[in-house]
Amino acid sequence: MREIVHLQTGQCGNQIGAAFWQTISGEHGLDSNGVYNGTSELQLERMSVYFNEASGNKYVPRAVLVDLEPGTMDAVRAGPFGQLFRPDNFVFGQSGAGNNWAKGHYTEGAELVDQVLDVVRREAEACDCLQGFQITHSLGGGTGAGMGTLLISKIREEFPDRMMATFSVVPSPKVSDTVVEPYNATLSVHQLVENSDETFCIDNEALYDICMRTLKLSNPSYGDLNHLVSAVMSGVTTCLRFPGQLNSDLRKLAVNMVPFPRLHFFMVGFAPLTSRGAHSFRAVTVPELTQQMFDPKNMMAASDFRNGRYLTCSAIFRGKVSMKEVEDQMRNVQNKNSSYFVEWIPNNVQTALCSIPPRGLKMSSTFVGNSTAIQELFKRIGEQFTAMFRRKAFLHWYTGEGMDEMEFTEAESNMNDLVSEYQQYQDAGVDEEEEEYEEEPLPEDE
């Protein structure tokens, strides 16, 4: 079986991770102690992708929980699914990174990283045929951003041929937790561009919007936001966890989604977005799902794909769906909105089907898009970064941990390069290349 090892780092990562495990335990018929009491053979068939089987019909998540302070871990352990995880897989420090990327990446985090790698190695050795790693973290803080990216690069060194998928919570434009978010995020993106294979960008503000606009929650809690993220994570990994007609895995997703190795930052969406209690009142159809899935309001990152073009995108449908209907709808979307898809990648929409819907729904769909509009997100962080870096504001927190200003400059220019690469492919057309070919034979006439 193709196993995935899951890492969660920092406060944000651990809370999203906990929500994710809660969601998929439910889908696989496990209770909060990991004991199987499901009804369907299909739940067991690929259980081993995320769970190790222990004695007595108990399943243990293949998860490594990392933080530089004990607080969040204790909360996870005390939470409803705290008894699910293997106690040895909690790795935590005492000091905290204090939202300082340098602490997470170079000082505090670097002291803890070998301990984490031992646990990762142990989990990897228990695998039959390891497919890759997934990591949940935020890019604005210290531990998730700094230590998360450190772990990614260390794992990359040790397992160079395995997939690395990250679910990264990007700082949002209006909702900010700390003043140094732009620094931490820029330094993290600098690492992710090089070391991750696929990064799913999630953004608190977009999640807030979805909760308020679509789910009509007047003051959403982080629990509600994490519930949305876990729905997407569960959707992206459905194909790996259940048999289906058209399966895809992390590597297939990457092959279909990443036209150029650096451009692997995806927007994600989920449909049907209904509040937790309302879904039982109406039937969902494939056309509705498709329409909702391609709706900018459903995107979990604060950038509007109407300002860019899709290089590629992938739709994962779950439930009793007719293959033909899905194909027709997807073709329909591409024909109607052809201006939003680049024309030099034919067939750039990939679909996958899985016959088992999420709990409480008849059918659902998860959307993953590689759109050039994601550059808005990097531009925004870049502008905030420049505004502070120009004045060298707050830099002493980083240089004090042994960082160099050069590193900041490098990270900044790497992110600017990323933005201009996206822009370049957004503007590229088919006709430009044809002109080049016509001009080539000219010198022979002389």
UniProtKB/Swiss-Prot annotation:
<feature type="binding site">
    <location>
        <position position="142"/>
    </location>
    <ligand>
        <name>GTP</name>
    </ligand>
</feature>
<dbReference type="GO" id="GO:0005200">
    <property type="term" value="F:structural constituent of cytoskeleton"/>
</dbReference>
<dbReference type="GO" id="GO:0005737">
    <property type="term" value="C:cytoplasm"/>
</dbReference>
<comment type="subunit">
    <text>Dimer of alpha and beta chains. A typical microtubule is a hollow water-filled tube with an outer diameter of 25 nm and an inner diameter of 15 nM. Alpha-beta heterodimers associate head-to-tail to form protofilaments running lengthwise along the microtubule wall with the beta-tubulin subunit facing the microtubule plus end conferring a structural polarity. Microtubules usually have 13 protofilaments but different protofilament numbers can be found in some organisms and specialized cells.</text>
</comment>
<keyword id="KW-0547">Nucleotide-binding</keyword>
<dbReference type="InterPro" id="IPR017975">
    <property type="entry name" value="Tubulin_CS"/>
</dbReference>
<dbReference type="GO" id="GO:0005525">
    <property type="term" value="F:GTP binding"/>
</dbReference>
<dbReference type="InterPro" id="IPR000217">
    <property type="entry name" value="Tubulin"/>
</dbReference>
<keyword id="KW-0206">Cytoskeleton</keyword>
<dbReference type="InterPro" id="IPR002453">
    <property type="entry name" value="Beta_tubulin"/>
</dbReference>
<comment type="similarity">
    <text>Belongs to the tubulin family.</text>
</comment>
<dbReference type="InterPro" id="IPR037103">
    <property type="entry name" value="Tubulin/FtsZ-like_C"/>
</dbReference>
<feature type="compositionally biased region" description="Acidic residues">
    <location>
        <begin position="429"/>
        <end position="446"/>
    </location>
</feature>
<dbReference type="GO" id="GO:0007017">
    <property type="term" value="P:microtubule-based process"/>
</dbReference>
<feature type="binding site">
    <location>
        <position position="226"/>
    </location>
    <ligand>
        <name>GTP</name>
    </ligand>
</feature>
<keyword id="KW-0963">Cytoplasm</keyword>
<dbReference type="InterPro" id="IPR003008">
    <property type="entry name" value="Tubulin_FtsZ_GTPase"/>
</dbReference>
<dbReference type="Pfam" id="PF03953">
    <property type="entry name" value="Tubulin_C"/>
</dbReference>
<dbReference type="GO" id="GO:0003924">
    <property type="term" value="F:GTPase activity"/>
</dbReference>
<keyword id="KW-0342">GTP-binding</keyword>
<dbReference type="GO" id="GO:0005874">
    <property type="term" value="C:microtubule"/>
</dbReference>
<feature type="region of interest" description="Disordered">
    <location>
        <begin position="423"/>
        <end position="446"/>
    </location>
</feature>
<feature type="binding site">
    <location>
        <position position="138"/>
    </location>
    <ligand>
        <name>GTP</name>
    </ligand>
</feature>
<dbReference type="GO" id="GO:0046872">
    <property type="term" value="F:metal ion binding"/>
</dbReference>
<feature type="binding site">
    <location>
        <position position="143"/>
    </location>
    <ligand>
        <name>GTP</name>
    </ligand>
</feature>
<feature type="binding site">
    <location>
        <position position="11"/>
    </location>
    <ligand>
        <name>GTP</name>
    </ligand>
</feature>
<dbReference type="InterPro" id="IPR013838">
    <property type="entry name" value="Beta-tubulin_BS"/>
</dbReference>
<dbReference type="Pfam" id="PF00091">
    <property type="entry name" value="Tubulin"/>
</dbReference>
<dbReference type="InterPro" id="IPR036525">
    <property type="entry name" value="Tubulin/FtsZ_GTPase_sf"/>
</dbReference>
<dbReference type="InterPro" id="IPR023123">
    <property type="entry name" value="Tubulin_C"/>
</dbReference>
<keyword id="KW-0460">Magnesium</keyword>
<dbReference type="InterPro" id="IPR018316">
    <property type="entry name" value="Tubulin/FtsZ_2-layer-sand-dom"/>
</dbReference>
<feature type="binding site">
    <location>
        <position position="204"/>
    </location>
    <ligand>
        <name>GTP</name>
    </ligand>
</feature>
<feature type="binding site">
    <location>
        <position position="69"/>
    </location>
    <ligand>
        <name>GTP</name>
    </ligand>
</feature>
<keyword id="KW-0493">Microtubule</keyword>
<dbReference type="InterPro" id="IPR008280">
    <property type="entry name" value="Tub_FtsZ_C"/>
</dbReference>
<feature type="binding site">
    <location>
        <position position="144"/>
    </location>
    <ligand>
        <name>GTP</name>
    </ligand>
</feature>
<comment type="function">
    <text>Tubulin is the major constituent of microtubules, a cylinder consisting of laterally associated linear protofilaments composed of alpha- and beta-tubulin heterodimers. Microtubules grow by the addition of GTP-tubulin dimers to the microtubule end, where a stabilizing cap forms. Below the cap, tubulin dimers are in GDP-bound state, owing to GTPase activity of alpha-tubulin.</text>
</comment>
<protein>
    <recommendedName>
        <fullName>Tubulin beta chain</fullName>
    </recommendedName>
</protein>
<feature type="binding site">
    <location>
        <position position="69"/>
    </location>
    <ligand>
        <name>Mg(2+)</name>
    </ligand>
</feature>
<keyword id="KW-0479">Metal-binding</keyword>
